[in-house]
Amino acid sequence: MAKFDLTAKNCQYLDRHLTFPLLEFLLQKKVFDQTSLLKFILETVSKTNMVDYKHDIRERLAMDKVHPDELAQGRANVLATLKELQAEVAPLMKCMEELKNPDSTKDSKSVIHALQQTLDYDIILSAQKLAKYLYECGNYNDSLSYLYVCMLVMEPNDKNYLGVLWGKLAVEILTLNWQTALEDLTRLRDFIENYNFSPIQVLQQRAWLIHWSVLVFFNHGKGRDLIIDMFLYKPQYLNAIQTMCPHILRYLATAVIINRGRRNALKDLIKVIQQESYTYRDPITEFLEHLYVNFDFEGARKKLHECQTVIVNDFFIIGCLTEFVENARLMIFETFCRIHQCITIGMLADKLNMKPDEAECWIVNLIRNARLDAKIDSKLGHVVMGTQPLSPYQQLVEKIDSLSVRSEALTLLVERKHKAKTQEAGEGHWKYY
């Protein structure tokens, strides 16, 4: 379903190393021409130091084989540069080894402070350069070690500190360390919000962070709540989505659909989807519009079928397919039941894209698991709904969420009016291109 593929849009906001898993995923799905895609990967990997990966892509393209001597020379050049950079940072690493020594009587904070005061700044820059070089070689774990050192000895007001934060987040994502990635994501977000960027720069930084965070949120246990809190209820990030990347609404909508505990976010989400429908729409956003705006159950049923195809071909959310279908069916069912108190199982089966016996079994399981206040009349083949008033607690939660959004928007407005004229910031992120 190439029409709804977001890989090209998403890759604009991702580091080239983060794009490789997405591009390899597309190759497996065979959505696009394989040769064209492999050529694009080759063009991208050629900008890195990943000699073996480049050689592998050339072989998959059945291009002229690289001479073994040429391949060996490429590896030798990379290793030679690595040795030079490692020699430059040797004094720094010797000090860091002292910190690791359990017999050392020195306090780690005092050692780090001493390093900041006495180390030649060029050595710290060399450590960052080495971390970046290792990263470009695809040696992410070793890169992480040097990035960690840079974070310890660099002052937050250093012009290169932000680049280190971006690099650390990239490495944690690529090594699938989701808990640490979430911590780095929070640290980076706080830094971006407090740094003296120009308005256009901070908008760009937020757009990059939004895309990187999708990778983290859909792989972390708490991510489904956090993505809603950040994308929908932080006005500055919602504004960035609406301004720079409305296609991110697909992932926000998916998070709300699979998160039964956040149904109170539906009203706000649908409002945003309607506002942005002229710039972006896909089967997932249209499913919600059909169901909650138009009450078009037939349209929602058809869109749910399309949603499954979209999700299966989307690297970010393919792992949510089963949950998505289950919760989407439940949403159709709940909405239909608000309108009709007594429904035939055959009618429900049609709306849910299920066979009658499957639909009856599905409803029985809902009732059994205390997720539904209803009774089944097997003789007549009817489902009779009970009353489902909104609990006082849920009403309170909705009001608090609404007040929280208004308060944050007002705070941002006040800060913007009192903020001094911003200075042009240096390089904004872990620069790859």
UniProtKB/Swiss-Prot annotation:
GO terms of molecular function: translation initiation factor activity
- State the name under which the record lists this protein: Eukaryotic translation initiation factor 3 subunit E
Pfam short name (any one): eIF3_N
Q: Quaternary structure?
A: Component of the eukaryotic translation initiation factor 3 (eIF-3) complex.
Q: Which domain of life does the protein's organism represent?
A: Eukaryota
**Listed disulfide bonds for this chain?**
none
- Give me the gene this protein comes from: eIF3-S6
InterPro entries, per the entry: eIF3e, eIF3e_N, PCI_dom, WH_DNA-bd_sf
Protein location: Cytoplasm
Keywords attached to this entry: Cytoplasm, Initiation factor, Protein biosynthesis
Per the record, its GO cellular-component terms are: eukaryotic 43S preinitiation complex; eukaryotic 48S preinitiation complex; eukaryotic translation initiation factor 3 complex; eukaryotic translation initiation factor 3 complex, eIF3e; nucleus
Q: Which positions fall inside the PCI domain?
A: 217-390
